[in-house]
Structure formats: C-alpha cells, structure tokens
C-alpha cells in the first residue's frame, strides 16, 4: 500500500487500500496529485498466485497499470489499461502529462520504451523507439531536460546507464 507522511514521520496517512502491489509513486509538481504503478489481481487464480507469493515475501510485478489520485487518496482512477508492464511514471513539469516506461507493445516482454499520456488517459505518444530497456524518466524542474536509464549503446549487455536529453515539446 501507499502512505504519505511529513518528513519528520508524523501525520501518516494511508493512500491505497486494495489487494495488490502499489509503488513507484510521485507527486505532481503542485503536490495535489499522486501517480503510481500497481499490479492488482482480479481473478481467483490471480489472487491465489499473488497471496502465495506474498506469503513468501515476494511479488511478481509483470502486469502493471498506472493509477492517479489526489494526494489524499481521493478520486483514485486507473490511468492506463494497456497490458503488460506500465510503470516508472513521472509528471511532466506542466502537471498535465505523465511520462512512463512500458513494454505493452512487446510480444516477448521486451523492449521497454518511454511513453507520454495525458492525465485523462488520452493522447498516448511513444517517446523512445528502441529495442532496449528505457525507464525511470525524470524531468528537470524547468522541463528542459529529461534524465532516464537505458541499456542502449552497451554492446548488447544488460548494464544500465543514465542518459540526459534535451526535451523538445
């Protein structure tokens, strides 16, 4: 589950309360919203598999979608319904779009590319076009730069490096 609290550990508030694996949350630039990824089992078979793994202290986050809510947990809604793993969300500095990593177009679970989507779940746009792993996008506060992790240009290995790109609207 997701919680918020003051930096000194006081005023702990639970944000989510549903069966599943919630995490990777970020606040919007104005602090009024939270974006996060979640794996929420629905069928009896999925629920059993999830609980069996959880009993061993494990999770299998292969099916994840993005969720958005107000910073107090109200108005929770699913932002994506793309399938596969949609994760590593981050707000555009305008607060009106989300950049995230996904393999929803992949047939074999790979590659992961970066995508952008409006807060209403519309206007999905692919940002990177590779056959590698692109994830963990973070904008500079002024929106001029994008930092992200990728295993591109590494000679076919799995080492992940940090890339910084000038952002073009």
Language-model regions, residue ranges each:
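Hydrophobic beta-strand positions that form the internal "hydrophobic ladder"
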Residues: 34, 98-99, 146
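A detector of tandem-repeat and repeat-rich interaction/domain scaffolds
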Residues: 6, 77-78, 125-128, 145
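Hydrophobic, aliphatic-enriched repeat segments that assemble into extended interaction scaffolds
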Residues: 24-39
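A flexible loop/linker signature enriched in serine peptidases of the S9 family
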Residues: 1, 16-21, 37-65, 78-86, ...
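Residue-level detector of Asp-centered blade-edge/turn motifs that repeat once per structural unit
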Residues: 29-30, 93-94, 141-142
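CBM-like carbohydrate-recognition segments
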Residues: 138-139, 146-152
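Short loop/turn segments that connect beta-strands within beta-propeller blades
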Residues: 6-10, 70-74, 118-122, 167-169
């Amino acid at each position: 589950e997701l919680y918020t609290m003051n930096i000194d550990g006081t005023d702990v508030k639970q944000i989510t309360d549903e069966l599943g694996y919630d995490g990777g949350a970020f606040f919007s630039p104005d602090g009024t919203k939270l974006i996060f990824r979640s794996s929420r089992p629905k069928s009896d078979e999925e629920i059993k598999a999830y609980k069996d793994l959880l009993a061993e202290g494990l999770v299998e986050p292969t099916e994840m979608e993005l969720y958005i809510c107000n910073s107090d947990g109200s108005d929770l809604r699913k932002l994506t319904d793309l399938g596969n793993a949609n994760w590593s969300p981050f707000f555009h500095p305008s607060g009106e779009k989300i950049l995230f990593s996904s393999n929803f177009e992949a047939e074999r679970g790979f590659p992961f590319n970066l995508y952008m989507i409006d807060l209403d779940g519309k206007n999905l746009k692919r940002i990177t076009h590779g056959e590698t792993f692109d994830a963990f996008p973070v904008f500079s506060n002024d929106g001029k730069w994008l930092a992200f992790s990728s295993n591109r240009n590494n000679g076919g290995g799995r080492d992940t490096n940090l890339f910084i790109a000038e952002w073009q609207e």
